[in-house]
Amino acid sequence: VKLPRIGIVRTHESTRKLARRVAAGTARIRSATVSFGSGRWFVSFSVEVERCGLAPTLPESVVGVDLGVKSLAVLSTGEVVPNPKHLEHALKELRRLGRQAARRQGPDRGTGRQPSKRWRQTHARIARLHSYVANARRDGLHKLSTRLVRSHTVVVVEDLNVAGMVHNRRLARHIAGVGMGEFRRQVEYKAGWSGQRVHVADRWYPSSKTCSGCGVVKAKLRLSERIFVCESCGMSIDRDLNAARNLAALVEASSPSCGATENEPAGNPCQSRTVRATGIATGRPAPHGAGQRRHREASTRD
């Protein structure tokens, strides 16, 4: 990479693919940004490419995805994607490095004291470990989102209130370590590339409380109840699998001409949002005051 006032700089990753596309005229570099983080220098390119919308080539297939903490995702097909828990596995080393950094001579703005070399080295190790955890989490989400988009024409996800869920101090770290918002972002832009659809279920749709067999909605469902037992038809099923099947049923039972519909907690029909290849979402916001009623359930959801 040739940078202004610096010259030619070797990169760790190969840039031959980008160079070939630029030489062929199928890509044009608009800008390059050099940044420093986790003890390493990075250069990122903003490239303009021509990407045409692709029509779905797969047979019609709908999959519901229920994200959680115990399992990363449960699909309506019955597949359970385990949660790798990268952050939990690195906590022991992070705490050890934190105690080690506390014993080093750090900076002091009052006296103008500079940090010691060992303090800088310890914090660089902490930054590299955090970067490793973030990269491992992002890599797992990329693999899952790519597999779902390539094997299904419609992916149904929930409009989760992640900002409200992390207010639960007991589950905040576990929820943040899953990357629910990042998963939805990846699925949406990858579906736009391949011509698939992403259906975003309404935030107030009771997917966990609704029986996937008969459609009856339970009044209460505690977080400790991992098995959903319907009092109407007697069906017994894992609560996460039940929620995933309900999400898939939103699209399977809807009409393409009028858009997918679902039921509010009170039973009234409401419009869901479908993100197509253009990335445009349609629908209406939740009713006024519903956030306070559903905040307790959303903050303890897994």
Regions found by a protein language model. Give the residues of each.
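Short, conserved catalytic/metal-binding motifs centered on acidic residues
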Residues: 65-66, 148, 155, 187, ...
